[in-house]
Amino acid sequence: MTRIRVAIRVPVGRPLRDIAAFAARCEDAGFDGVGIHDHPSSGRDAYLALALAAQATRHLRLFPATSSPVVRHPLVLASLANSLQEIAPGRTCLTVAPGFISTRSIGQPRAGLKFMRDAIGDLRHLLAGETVGFGPTATRLRNRTAAPPVYLLAAGPRMIELAGEVADGAFLMVGLDPASIRAARRHLEIGATRAGRTLADIPVVFVVTLGLGPNDTVGAQWVRSWFQPGQPFLAYPSVANLRWLREAGFELDEAHDPTAIPEDRAHQIADAFGLFGSPERCADRLLQAREESGVDDVFLFPAHDLAGGYAMPEAEVDAFERIIRSRLGV
């Protein structure tokens, strides 16, 4: 059976050198990777944090989680990705997404499909050393290293199809229910077919929400909570979450009141949505997802609301080192 590779989201919630030390702590705890969120409004740059983390670690996979080509021009992103690959050869990838907090902070909407298609194409061409036209200007990336792969973080069906068509790989936030994963893979395959590829050509990392607690009631608590006023927890970071919950048999309106979800129903939704409860239960649920759906590469996304978005995942790293790691056989 394939070993499950596990990375974890780390926010820029501390001074940069402390974040690098925390990345080293994650490596020692047994994680395969760390993704540092790219929110320029935080006042701390994700790529500087990743560069320092690269110097503090030996084999940890490092990537932004995630960068928006709306906020950072594709040439800037390509240069940053190339630089990070130079510092940590073979340990990096570039992950891009339409944007949420980062685009909102500059007063711009999320990127649409065409914008992301063009941006990913430009990024891959630049990283391959090819010339790309920006308006009347032809530009080429100099001082290249080996090209890092470009992953698209996709939540909705059409964005998942785009990942299958134009990206080197996909980060999918579709929950853990087998029906949801099957549906998402069908869309990934649609995109892959357009480009003459198969699913086997596209590495997939599943973005999995993790909410630790003494028992599984914590899952229902998160499901019945708000991310911020007017935005249910289940609709963060994308309302597309509700699309995949429908595949799992749960009908929720985009503007639903989470507090009105019956508690027993909330427990079921939590089990389809992510990993909730004790470390032992979370590990067993992840093993179940591997057995049912072949989930073998995950990016843990610690559950949080807007106010808690910069809290460091201390408890999650501790639980992984003490319990989850050995239970997964990592």
Where are these regions (language model features)?
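Glycine-rich, proline-tolerant flexible connector loops at the mouths of alpha/beta enzymes
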Residues: 33-56, 68, 100-102, 175-178, ...
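Acidic (Asp/Glu)-rich catalytic clusters
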Residues: 23-28, 50-61, 81-92, 164-165, ...
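Alpha-helix-loop-beta-strand connector modules within alpha/beta enzyme cores
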Residues: 47-67, 71, 119, 126, ...
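Short, acidic/polar
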Residues: 14-26, 77-80, 154-165, 279-289
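N-terminal beta1-alpha1-beta2 module of alpha/beta enzyme domains
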Residues: 1-65, 148
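Active-site mouth loops of central-metabolism enzymes
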Residues: 4-17, 67-74, 144-155, 210-213, ...
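An alpha-helical appendage that flanks or caps ligand/catalytic pockets
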Residues: 2, 109-141, 181, 186-292
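Hydrophobic faces of well-ordered beta-strands that scaffold small-molecule active sites
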Residues: 4-10, 34-36, 61-65, 92-96, ...
